[in-house]
């Protein structure tokens, strides 16, 4: 499976393809796709007994400030299998830092063709406060039992902030020729 052939989106930053690494509500295991082989690897077992509140993945052909592709959380009623690709629209961003530096998380919902329920969700203000609190709580606490690891939540940003981050990460990857097929 060569996930490197998956484009970042049809209309960056308004339209993105998210490669799922971790299903929502799954066991506390951090998976990462190896960008060269496309295979899913176990990164680590998370000692804090928590589950991911949303499907967790990344946008291919992007480079975030931590040196990895840009992370994305995709809320849905159903867990999406690891290594699946889902067509999404960005609605917001959770800005945070960890022991490696800036570590933004884009929040994106499935395109309405996939699920009509998200048709009118266009900004982070359109999702429930409870879901935002669950996401914040997860990231504030999931590393607490790991030595020398920490997370600081900076705050939420809106759809425009998310699109700016996506553009920056896409252009950064392009400039550095990282994750791009030639």
UniProtKB/Swiss-Prot annotation:
Class of this enzyme: hydrolase
Cell location: Cytoplasm
GO molecular function: inorganic diphosphate phosphatase activity; magnesium ion binding
EC identifiers of the protein: 3.6.1.1
Source taxon at top rank: Bacteria
Residue numbers binding substrate: 30, 44, 56, 142
This protein's UniProt keywords: Cytoplasm, Hydrolase, Magnesium, Metal-binding
GO cellular component: cytoplasm
Positions with a binding annotation for Mg(2+) 2: 71
Catalytic activity: diphosphate + H2O = 2 phosphate + H(+)
Cofactor: Mg(2+)
Alphabetized InterPro entries for the sequence: Pyrophosphatase, Pyrophosphatase_sf
Any one biological process term the GO annotation gives: phosphate-containing compound metabolic process
Keyword Cell membrane belongs to the record: no
SUPFAM superfamilies with a match to the protein in the record: Inorganic pyrophosphatase (SSF50324)
Pfam families in the record: Pyrophosphatase (PF00719)
Residues annotated for Mg(2+) 1 binding in this entry: 66, 71, 103
Family in the record: Belongs to the PPase family.
Subunit structure: Homohexamer.
Function noted in UniProt: Catalyzes the hydrolysis of inorganic pyrophosphate (PPi) forming two phosphate ions.
PANTHER family: INORGANIC PYROPHOSPHATASE
Protein's recorded name: Inorganic pyrophosphatase
Biological source species: Buchnera aphidicola subsp. Acyrthosiphon pisum (strain APS) (Acyrthosiphon pisum symbiotic bacterium)
Lineage: Bacteria, Pseudomonadati, Pseudomonadota, Gammaproteobacteria, Enterobacterales
Annotated gene: ppa
């Amino acid at each position: 499976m060569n996930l490197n052939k998956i484009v970042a989106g049809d209309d960056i930053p308004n339209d993105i393809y998210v490669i799922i690494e971790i299903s929502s509500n799954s066991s506390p295991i951090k998976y990462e796709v190896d960008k060269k082989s496309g295979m899913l690897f176990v990164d680590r077992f998370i000692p804090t007994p928590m589950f991911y509140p949303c499907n967790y993945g990344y946008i291919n052909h992007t480079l975030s400030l931590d040196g990895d592709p840009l992370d994305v959380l995709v809320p849905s009623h159903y867990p999406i299998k690891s290594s699946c690709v889902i067509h999404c629209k960005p609605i917001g961003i959770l800005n945070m830092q960890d022991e490696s530096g800036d570590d933004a998380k884009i929040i994106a919902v499935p395109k309405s063709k996939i699920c009509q329920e998200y048709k009118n969700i266009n900004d982070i203000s359109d999702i429930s406060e409870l879901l935002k609190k669950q996401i914040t709580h997860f990231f504030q606490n999931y590393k607490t039992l790991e030595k020398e690891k920490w997370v600081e939540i900076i705050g939420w940003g809106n759809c425009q902030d998310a699109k700016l981050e996506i553009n920056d990460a896409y252009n950064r990857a392009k400039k550095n020729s990282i994750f791009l097929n030639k």
